[in-house]
Amino acid sequence: MGSYSSDDVEVIREAGRAQGLATILAIGTATPPNCVAQADYADYYFRVTKSEHMVDLKEKFKRICEKTAIKKRYLALTEDYLQENPTMCEFMAPSLNARQDLVVTGVPMLGKEAAVKAIDEWGLPKSKITHLIFCTTAGVDMPGADYQLVKLLGLSPSVKRYMLYQQGCAAGGTVLRLAKDLAENNKGSRVLIVCSEITAILFHGPNENHLDSLVAQALFGDGAAALIVGSGPHLAVERPIFEIVSTDQTILPDTEKAMKLHLREGGLTFQLHRDVPLMVAKNIENAAEKALSPLGITDWNSVFWMVHPGGRAILDQVERKLNLKEDKLRASRHVLSEYGNLISACVLFIIDEVRKRSMAEGKSTTGEGLDCGVLFGFGPGMTVETVVLRSVRVTAAVANGN
Protein backbone atom coordinates (compact mmCIF):
# COMPACT_ATOMS: atom_id res chain seq x y z
CA MET A 1 0.00 0.00 0.00
CA GLY A 2 1.17 3.54 -0.76
CA SER A 3 1.55 6.23 1.82
CA TYR A 4 0.90 9.94 1.76
CA SER A 5 1.91 12.86 3.93
CA SER A 6 0.09 15.93 5.16
CA ASP A 7 2.06 17.88 2.55
CA ASP A 8 0.51 15.73 -0.18
CA VAL A 9 -2.95 16.47 1.14
CA GLU A 10 -2.18 20.18 1.26
CA VAL A 11 -0.99 20.14 -2.35
CA ILE A 12 -4.24 18.49 -3.43
CA ARG A 13 -6.21 20.98 -1.35
CA GLU A 14 -4.46 24.00 -2.84
CA ALA A 15 -4.81 22.63 -6.38
CA GLY A 16 -8.57 22.56 -5.92
CA ARG A 17 -8.81 26.22 -4.96
CA ALA A 18 -9.64 28.89 -7.50
CA GLN A 19 -7.49 31.91 -8.20
CA GLY A 20 -8.97 35.33 -7.55
CA LEU A 21 -12.16 36.65 -6.02
CA ALA A 22 -15.61 35.24 -6.66
CA THR A 23 -17.19 37.36 -9.38
CA ILE A 24 -20.78 38.01 -10.44
CA LEU A 25 -20.82 37.11 -14.14
CA ALA A 26 -24.49 37.46 -15.09
CA ILE A 27 -27.84 38.56 -13.65
CA GLY A 28 -31.41 37.74 -14.65
CA THR A 29 -34.72 38.78 -13.08
CA ALA A 30 -38.36 37.81 -13.54
CA THR A 31 -41.78 38.70 -12.15
CA PRO A 32 -45.27 37.21 -12.49
CA PRO A 33 -47.39 38.86 -15.23
CA ASN A 34 -50.03 40.07 -12.76
CA CYS A 35 -49.17 43.69 -11.87
CA VAL A 36 -51.11 45.66 -9.24
CA ALA A 37 -50.99 49.41 -8.69
CA GLN A 38 -50.43 50.32 -5.05
CA ALA A 39 -52.93 53.19 -5.27
CA ASP A 40 -55.69 50.71 -6.14
CA TYR A 41 -54.65 47.85 -3.89
CA ALA A 42 -56.69 48.74 -0.79
CA ASP A 43 -59.93 48.72 -2.78
CA TYR A 44 -58.96 45.44 -4.46
CA TYR A 45 -57.85 43.78 -1.21
CA PHE A 46 -60.99 44.60 0.78
CA ARG A 47 -63.21 43.64 -2.15
CA VAL A 48 -61.67 40.20 -2.83
CA THR A 49 -61.64 39.37 0.88
CA LYS A 50 -65.29 40.50 1.19
CA SER A 51 -64.30 42.94 3.93
CA GLU A 52 -65.66 46.21 2.56
CA HIS A 53 -67.86 46.57 5.64
CA MET A 54 -64.68 47.23 7.67
CA VAL A 55 -64.68 50.87 6.60
CA ASP A 56 -62.32 52.28 9.24
CA LEU A 57 -59.80 49.48 8.80
CA LYS A 58 -59.88 49.97 5.05
CA GLU A 59 -59.05 53.66 5.46
CA LYS A 60 -56.19 52.73 7.77
CA PHE A 61 -54.91 50.25 5.20
CA LYS A 62 -55.05 52.93 2.50
CA ARG A 63 -52.82 55.13 4.64
CA ILE A 64 -50.42 52.22 5.17
CA CYS A 65 -50.22 51.67 1.41
CA GLU A 66 -49.62 55.38 0.77
CA LYS A 67 -46.70 55.48 3.21
CA THR A 68 -44.84 52.53 1.66
CA ALA A 69 -43.39 54.57 -1.25
CA ILE A 70 -44.40 51.64 -3.49
CA LYS A 71 -45.97 52.39 -6.89
CA LYS A 72 -46.67 48.85 -8.03
CA ARG A 73 -46.03 45.20 -7.28
CA TYR A 74 -46.22 41.90 -9.16
CA LEU A 75 -48.25 39.13 -7.52
CA ALA A 76 -48.69 35.52 -8.56
CA LEU A 77 -51.83 35.24 -6.42
CA THR A 78 -54.76 36.24 -8.63
CA GLU A 79 -58.39 37.03 -7.90
CA ASP A 80 -59.44 33.87 -9.75
CA TYR A 81 -57.27 31.74 -7.46
CA LEU A 82 -58.74 33.41 -4.38
CA GLN A 83 -62.27 32.77 -5.64
CA GLU A 84 -61.39 29.09 -6.08
CA ASN A 85 -59.87 28.99 -2.57
CA PRO A 86 -61.99 31.37 -0.45
CA THR A 87 -60.53 30.22 2.88
CA MET A 88 -57.35 32.08 1.95
CA CYS A 89 -59.34 35.29 2.35
CA GLU A 90 -60.41 34.49 5.92
CA PHE A 91 -57.91 35.58 8.54
CA MET A 92 -55.96 32.48 9.67
CA ALA A 93 -58.54 30.00 8.34
CA PRO A 94 -56.91 26.63 7.52
CA SER A 95 -55.69 27.08 3.95
CA LEU A 96 -52.13 25.79 3.83
CA ASN A 97 -52.87 23.22 1.13
CA ALA A 98 -54.13 25.86 -1.31
CA ARG A 99 -51.11 28.04 -0.63
CA GLN A 100 -48.71 25.14 -1.07
CA ASP A 101 -50.34 24.10 -4.34
CA LEU A 102 -49.62 27.55 -5.75
CA VAL A 103 -46.08 28.10 -4.51
CA VAL A 104 -44.61 24.59 -4.82
CA THR A 105 -45.04 24.77 -8.58
CA GLY A 106 -44.85 28.54 -9.02
CA VAL A 107 -41.59 29.20 -7.16
CA PRO A 108 -39.36 26.97 -9.34
CA MET A 109 -41.14 28.11 -12.52
CA LEU A 110 -40.54 31.77 -11.70
CA GLY A 111 -36.97 30.91 -10.75
CA LYS A 112 -36.52 29.25 -14.12
CA GLU A 113 -37.49 32.47 -15.93
CA ALA A 114 -34.81 34.42 -14.10
CA ALA A 115 -32.23 31.65 -14.49
CA VAL A 116 -32.74 31.41 -18.26
CA LYS A 117 -32.09 35.15 -18.57
CA ALA A 118 -28.92 34.90 -16.46
CA ILE A 119 -27.62 31.92 -18.44
CA ASP A 120 -28.35 33.70 -21.72
CA GLU A 121 -26.44 36.77 -20.54
CA TRP A 122 -23.57 34.62 -19.30
CA GLY A 123 -23.28 33.08 -22.75
CA LEU A 124 -21.76 29.73 -21.82
CA PRO A 125 -23.42 26.29 -21.96
CA LYS A 126 -25.54 25.43 -18.94
CA SER A 127 -23.49 22.22 -18.68
CA LYS A 128 -20.74 24.43 -17.20
CA ILE A 129 -22.86 25.09 -14.09
CA THR A 130 -21.38 23.04 -11.24
CA HIS A 131 -23.36 24.28 -8.22
CA LEU A 132 -26.91 25.49 -7.58
CA ILE A 133 -28.09 27.58 -4.63
CA PHE A 134 -31.87 27.97 -4.47
CA CYS A 135 -33.52 30.18 -1.87
CA THR A 136 -37.19 30.83 -1.13
CA THR A 137 -39.39 31.69 1.82
CA ALA A 138 -42.33 29.59 0.69
CA GLY A 139 -43.16 26.15 -0.60
CA VAL A 140 -41.24 23.74 1.62
CA ASP A 141 -41.39 20.45 -0.25
CA MET A 142 -39.32 17.33 -0.98
CA PRO A 143 -37.79 17.01 -3.44
CA GLY A 144 -37.47 20.77 -3.28
CA ALA A 145 -37.40 23.71 -5.65
CA ASP A 146 -33.69 23.11 -6.27
CA TYR A 147 -34.47 19.66 -7.68
CA GLN A 148 -37.37 21.01 -9.72
CA LEU A 149 -35.15 23.70 -11.22
CA VAL A 150 -32.53 21.16 -12.26
CA LYS A 151 -35.27 19.34 -14.18
CA LEU A 152 -36.78 22.53 -15.64
CA LEU A 153 -33.43 23.83 -16.90
CA GLY A 154 -32.01 20.47 -17.92
CA LEU A 155 -28.95 20.87 -15.70
CA SER A 156 -26.55 18.03 -15.07
CA PRO A 157 -27.97 15.52 -12.55
CA SER A 158 -24.65 15.75 -10.71
CA VAL A 159 -24.85 19.51 -10.13
CA LYS A 160 -24.23 20.17 -6.42
CA ARG A 161 -27.40 21.63 -4.91
CA TYR A 162 -28.05 23.75 -1.82
CA MET A 163 -31.65 24.49 -0.80
CA LEU A 164 -32.40 27.36 1.59
CA TYR A 165 -35.93 27.76 2.96
CA GLN A 166 -37.41 30.50 5.14
CA GLN A 167 -34.31 32.66 5.59
CA GLY A 168 -36.27 35.88 5.15
CA CYS A 169 -35.09 39.21 3.81
CA ALA A 170 -31.42 38.77 4.78
CA ALA A 171 -31.07 35.81 2.44
CA GLY A 172 -30.00 37.81 -0.61
CA GLY A 173 -26.76 38.37 1.26
CA THR A 174 -26.69 34.78 2.51
CA VAL A 175 -26.64 33.31 -1.00
CA LEU A 176 -23.80 35.62 -2.05
CA ARG A 177 -21.79 34.58 1.00
CA LEU A 178 -22.32 30.90 0.25
CA ALA A 179 -21.58 31.37 -3.47
CA LYS A 180 -18.32 33.14 -2.67
CA ASP A 181 -17.16 30.21 -0.52
CA LEU A 182 -18.13 27.69 -3.19
CA ALA A 183 -16.58 29.57 -6.11
CA GLU A 184 -13.28 30.35 -4.41
CA ASN A 185 -12.77 26.87 -2.98
CA ASN A 186 -13.73 24.84 -6.06
CA LYS A 187 -11.50 25.59 -9.03
CA GLY A 188 -13.41 26.05 -12.26
CA SER A 189 -16.80 26.04 -10.55
CA ARG A 190 -19.71 28.15 -11.76
CA VAL A 191 -22.47 28.71 -9.23
CA LEU A 192 -26.06 29.44 -10.24
CA ILE A 193 -27.90 31.39 -7.54
CA VAL A 194 -31.69 31.59 -7.70
CA CYS A 195 -33.87 33.47 -5.22
CA SER A 196 -37.55 33.06 -6.05
CA GLU A 197 -40.35 34.47 -3.92
CA ILE A 198 -44.13 34.10 -4.15
CA THR A 199 -45.79 35.71 -1.16
CA ALA A 200 -49.16 33.94 -1.35
CA ILE A 201 -48.07 32.13 1.80
CA LEU A 202 -48.32 35.53 3.59
CA PHE A 203 -51.72 36.56 2.22
CA HIS A 204 -54.45 36.97 4.86
CA GLY A 205 -57.74 38.78 5.05
CA PRO A 206 -57.86 41.90 7.27
CA ASN A 207 -58.18 41.69 11.05
CA GLU A 208 -58.45 44.69 13.36
CA ASN A 209 -56.26 43.05 15.99
CA HIS A 210 -53.41 42.19 13.64
CA LEU A 211 -52.10 45.32 11.97
CA ASP A 212 -48.73 43.63 11.37
CA SER A 213 -50.50 41.43 8.85
CA LEU A 214 -51.88 44.50 7.09
CA VAL A 215 -48.36 45.89 6.79
CA ALA A 216 -47.32 42.65 5.08
CA GLN A 217 -50.24 42.92 2.62
CA ALA A 218 -49.04 46.40 1.65
CA LEU A 219 -45.33 45.67 1.45
CA PHE A 220 -44.37 42.36 -0.14
CA GLY A 221 -44.18 41.52 -3.83
CA ASP A 222 -43.25 38.51 -5.94
CA GLY A 223 -40.17 38.08 -8.10
CA ALA A 224 -37.12 35.97 -8.82
CA ALA A 225 -33.48 36.83 -9.45
CA ALA A 226 -30.66 34.62 -10.69
CA LEU A 227 -26.90 35.17 -10.74
CA ILE A 228 -23.93 33.26 -12.13
CA VAL A 229 -20.89 33.44 -9.84
CA GLY A 230 -17.39 32.12 -10.45
CA SER A 231 -13.73 32.84 -9.70
CA GLY A 232 -11.09 33.40 -12.36
CA PRO A 233 -13.44 34.47 -15.17
CA HIS A 234 -12.45 33.68 -18.75
CA LEU A 235 -12.42 37.23 -20.07
CA ALA A 236 -12.64 36.15 -23.70
CA VAL A 237 -16.14 34.80 -23.10
CA GLU A 238 -17.26 35.89 -19.61
CA ARG A 239 -18.16 39.45 -18.59
CA PRO A 240 -17.52 40.33 -14.93
CA ILE A 241 -20.03 42.67 -13.28
CA PHE A 242 -18.94 42.83 -9.61
CA GLU A 243 -16.30 41.06 -7.52
CA ILE A 244 -17.37 39.77 -4.10
CA VAL A 245 -14.62 41.10 -1.82
CA SER A 246 -15.88 39.98 1.59
CA THR A 247 -18.99 38.80 3.41
CA ASP A 248 -20.21 38.81 6.99
CA GLN A 249 -23.22 37.78 9.04
CA THR A 250 -24.18 38.95 12.50
CA ILE A 251 -27.14 38.85 14.88
CA LEU A 252 -28.04 42.24 16.33
CA PRO A 253 -28.20 42.28 20.15
CA ASP A 254 -31.57 42.32 21.90
CA THR A 255 -33.60 41.95 18.70
CA GLU A 256 -35.05 38.46 19.12
CA LYS A 257 -38.62 39.76 19.02
CA ALA A 258 -38.10 42.40 16.34
CA MET A 259 -39.27 40.33 13.39
CA LYS A 260 -40.87 36.90 13.54
CA LEU A 261 -42.67 34.69 11.03
CA HIS A 262 -44.37 31.39 11.87
CA LEU A 263 -45.83 28.80 9.49
CA ARG A 264 -49.34 27.80 10.56
CA GLU A 265 -52.36 26.05 9.03
CA GLY A 266 -53.58 29.48 7.98
CA GLY A 267 -50.33 30.42 6.25
CA LEU A 268 -47.25 32.34 7.31
CA THR A 269 -47.82 34.85 10.10
CA PHE A 270 -45.83 38.09 10.25
CA GLN A 271 -44.88 40.06 13.36
CA LEU A 272 -42.86 43.26 13.06
CA HIS A 273 -41.79 45.51 15.92
CA ARG A 274 -42.38 49.16 15.13
CA ASP A 275 -38.82 50.04 16.19
CA VAL A 276 -37.11 47.84 13.56
CA PRO A 277 -35.94 50.88 11.53
CA LEU A 278 -34.35 52.34 14.67
CA MET A 279 -32.74 48.99 15.51
CA VAL A 280 -31.18 48.88 12.07
CA ALA A 281 -30.02 52.50 12.31
CA LYS A 282 -28.48 51.91 15.73
CA ASN A 283 -26.25 49.15 14.34
CA ILE A 284 -25.65 50.15 10.72
CA GLU A 285 -22.55 52.28 11.33
CA ASN A 286 -20.77 49.50 13.20
CA ALA A 287 -21.60 47.09 10.39
CA ALA A 288 -20.32 49.55 7.78
CA GLU A 289 -17.09 50.14 9.71
CA LYS A 290 -16.49 46.41 10.09
CA ALA A 291 -16.99 45.88 6.36
CA LEU A 292 -15.16 48.89 4.94
CA SER A 293 -12.42 49.80 7.44
CA PRO A 294 -10.16 46.92 6.27
CA LEU A 295 -10.13 48.73 2.91
CA GLY A 296 -9.29 52.05 4.55
CA ILE A 297 -12.71 53.49 3.72
CA THR A 298 -14.24 55.89 6.24
CA ASP A 299 -16.21 58.19 3.93
CA TRP A 300 -19.58 56.49 3.48
CA ASN A 301 -20.38 58.67 0.46
CA SER A 302 -17.31 57.41 -1.40
CA VAL A 303 -18.89 53.98 -2.00
CA PHE A 304 -22.09 52.73 -3.66
CA TRP A 305 -24.88 51.32 -1.49
CA MET A 306 -27.25 48.39 -1.95
CA VAL A 307 -29.51 48.33 1.12
CA HIS A 308 -32.40 45.91 1.42
CA PRO A 309 -35.56 48.07 1.41
CA GLY A 310 -37.43 46.31 4.19
CA GLY A 311 -39.55 49.43 4.14
CA ARG A 312 -39.28 53.13 3.43
CA ALA A 313 -38.54 53.91 7.09
CA ILE A 314 -35.50 51.61 7.12
CA LEU A 315 -33.99 53.40 4.12
CA ASP A 316 -34.75 56.80 5.66
CA GLN A 317 -33.10 55.83 8.95
CA VAL A 318 -29.99 54.38 7.28
CA GLU A 319 -29.62 57.48 5.13
CA ARG A 320 -29.99 59.76 8.15
CA LYS A 321 -27.69 57.79 10.46
CA LEU A 322 -24.83 57.61 7.95
CA ASN A 323 -25.36 61.12 6.54
CA LEU A 324 -25.63 59.67 3.06
CA LYS A 325 -26.25 61.91 0.09
CA GLU A 326 -29.79 61.72 -1.24
CA ASP A 327 -28.86 59.69 -4.33
CA LYS A 328 -26.92 57.01 -2.44
CA LEU A 329 -29.98 54.82 -1.85
CA ARG A 330 -31.53 55.59 -5.23
CA ALA A 331 -31.34 51.99 -6.46
CA SER A 332 -32.89 50.62 -3.25
CA ARG A 333 -35.72 53.14 -3.40
CA HIS A 334 -36.31 52.42 -7.09
CA VAL A 335 -36.65 48.66 -6.54
CA LEU A 336 -38.98 49.22 -3.58
CA SER A 337 -41.10 51.59 -5.67
CA GLU A 338 -41.33 49.34 -8.73
CA TYR A 339 -41.57 45.89 -7.10
CA GLY A 340 -42.19 46.17 -3.35
CA ASN A 341 -40.19 44.12 -0.86
CA LEU A 342 -39.13 40.98 -2.76
CA ILE A 343 -37.70 39.27 0.35
CA SER A 344 -34.55 37.29 -0.61
CA ALA A 345 -34.60 38.42 -4.26
CA CYS A 346 -34.73 42.12 -3.40
CA VAL A 347 -31.02 42.96 -3.04
CA LEU A 348 -30.26 40.94 -6.18
CA PHE A 349 -32.70 43.17 -8.09
CA ILE A 350 -30.83 46.13 -6.59
CA ILE A 351 -27.48 44.79 -7.85
CA ASP A 352 -29.02 44.58 -11.31
CA GLU A 353 -30.45 48.09 -11.04
CA VAL A 354 -27.07 49.58 -10.02
CA ARG A 355 -25.18 48.01 -12.91
CA LYS A 356 -27.87 48.85 -15.50
CA ARG A 357 -28.20 52.44 -14.37
CA SER A 358 -24.42 52.86 -14.26
CA MET A 359 -24.17 51.69 -17.87
CA ALA A 360 -27.13 53.81 -19.02
CA GLU A 361 -25.73 56.95 -17.39
CA GLY A 362 -22.25 56.46 -18.83
CA LYS A 363 -20.53 55.90 -15.48
CA SER A 364 -16.92 54.70 -15.50
CA THR A 365 -17.68 51.57 -13.45
CA THR A 366 -20.58 49.18 -12.91
CA GLY A 367 -20.89 50.66 -9.41
CA GLU A 368 -22.03 54.21 -10.17
CA GLY A 369 -18.51 55.21 -11.23
CA LEU A 370 -17.07 54.16 -7.85
CA ASP A 371 -14.67 51.34 -7.03
CA CYS A 372 -16.28 49.74 -3.98
CA GLY A 373 -19.71 49.32 -2.49
CA VAL A 374 -21.54 47.57 0.29
CA LEU A 375 -24.72 45.47 0.32
CA PHE A 376 -26.87 44.96 3.41
CA GLY A 377 -29.66 42.45 3.99
CA PHE A 378 -31.83 42.51 7.13
CA GLY A 379 -33.91 39.55 8.26
CA PRO A 380 -35.52 37.76 11.20
CA GLY A 381 -33.31 37.43 14.23
CA MET A 382 -32.49 40.24 13.57
CA THR A 383 -29.83 38.97 11.24
CA VAL A 384 -27.68 41.29 9.13
CA GLU A 385 -25.82 40.07 6.06
CA THR A 386 -23.04 42.34 4.77
CA VAL A 387 -21.33 41.98 1.39
CA VAL A 388 -18.54 44.20 0.08
CA LEU A 389 -18.44 44.42 -3.72
CA ARG A 390 -15.84 45.80 -6.10
CA SER A 391 -17.08 47.21 -9.38
CA VAL A 392 -15.70 46.61 -12.87
CA ARG A 393 -14.54 49.33 -15.26
CA VAL A 394 -17.29 49.94 -17.79
CA THR A 395 -14.77 50.19 -20.63
CA ALA A 396 -13.60 46.67 -19.82
CA ALA A 397 -17.17 45.42 -19.52
CA VAL A 398 -18.09 46.92 -22.90
CA ALA A 399 -14.98 45.45 -24.49
CA ASN A 400 -16.10 42.04 -23.27
CA GLY A 401 -19.59 42.47 -24.70
CA ASN A 402 -21.60 43.83 -21.73
Curated annotation (Swiss-Prot):
It is an enzyme of class 2 (transferase). The active site is at C169. The keyword Transferase applies. The keyword Methyltransferase does not apply. Acetoacetyl-CoA binds at K60, R63, C169, L272, R274, G310, R312, A313. It catalyses: 2 malonyl-CoA + acetyl-CoA + 2 H(+) = triacetate lactone + 2 CO2 + 3 CoA. It comes from the Eukaryota. It holds the Pfam family Chal_sti_synt_C. Expressed in both vegetative and reproductive organs. The expression is strong in the leaf, scape (the inflorescence stem) and corolla (both in the ligule and the unpigmented tube), moderate in the bract and carpel, detectable in the root and pappus but not detectable in the stamen. Its EC number is 2.3.1.-. Keywords: Acyltransferase, Transferase. One of its GO terms (molecular function) is acyltransferase activity, transferring groups other than amino-acyl groups. One of its GO terms (biological process) is polyketide biosynthetic process. SUPFAM superfamilies: Thiolase-like (SSF53901). CDD domains: CHS_like. Belongs to the thiolase-like superfamily. Chalcone/stilbene synthases family. Polyketide synthase, which uses acetyl-CoA and two condensation reactions with malonyl-CoA to form triacetic acid lactone (also called methylpyrone), a precursor of phytoalexin. May participate in insect and pathogen resistance. This is 2-pyrone synthase. It comes from Gerbera hybrida. The gene is 2PS.
